[in-house]
Amino acid sequence: VIDSTGQVVAEAVLGDGIEHVATTPAGQTWVGYFDEGVFGNHGWGDPDLDGPEPVGVSGLVRFDERLQRTWEYPDTAGFGDIYDCYALNVTGESAWACFYDGFPVVRIADDAVSGWTNKASGVRAVVTDGLRCALVGGYGADRDRVVTGLLTDRGRLDVRCTTRLALPGGPAATGRYTVTGRGDVLHVLTGTAHLRLDLDQLFT
């Protein structure tokens, strides 16, 4: 971690197989891991090499400002284990995630986990204001899919619309691009362009 003057203020190994990194106003760092970070690679978790347990074995870990682990996704959360953290959205001090293989939407607030089931798979970005939610991405032909809905008190996503992500220059998103959610804003990176869509736009 480097401060505004360029000085290194913290340094640590956060593990292998890092998929997402996001920080909070209080200086916390959330890290989501893909499968190699969960199950081990390059010696991590290898019993033949007496390798250490992967840092990301839980799939989602929070570190403090000194990069010490303060929380990790529990296997008792009730929404399945994280085999690959496909999407991570950090807003304030809370985090939202969507992960393989069941792709529930989960929220971590004050260390408590709540979640909502849905039928989408391959989700690459979660965009939410806490009541509404958009799930962006999918497998194959659904890579530009956008599923919007309401997060109900029954623990499931009440889908309102399924549409496609459209980028400038064409009716549908084509080519290589990256999507990520931050609060109620979807960020799209394509080439040298950085595009933003808020939740109101995704719901129209």
Predicted regions and their residues:
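Repeated scaffold domains used in trafficking and secretory/extracellular systems
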Residues: 13-24, 78-88, 118-135, 165-183
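Intrinsically disordered, low-complexity segments enriched in Gly and acidic/Ser/Thr residues
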Residues: 106-170
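Extended, charged low-complexity segments
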Residues: 150, 154-204
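Short, conserved, GDST-rich strand-edge loop motifs in beta-rich repeat architectures
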Residues: 31-57
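Short loop/turn segments that connect beta-strands within beta-propeller blades
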Residues: 2-6, 64-66, 108-112, 153
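A short beta-strand motif characteristic of beta-propeller blades
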Residues: 6-13, 69-79, 112-118, 158-168
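A short loop-to-beta-strand structural motif that recurs across blades of beta-propeller domains
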Residues: 1, 56-61, 104, 193
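Short beta-strand elements that form the blades of beta-propeller/WD-repeat-like
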Residues: 27-39, 87-100, 106, 126-149, ...
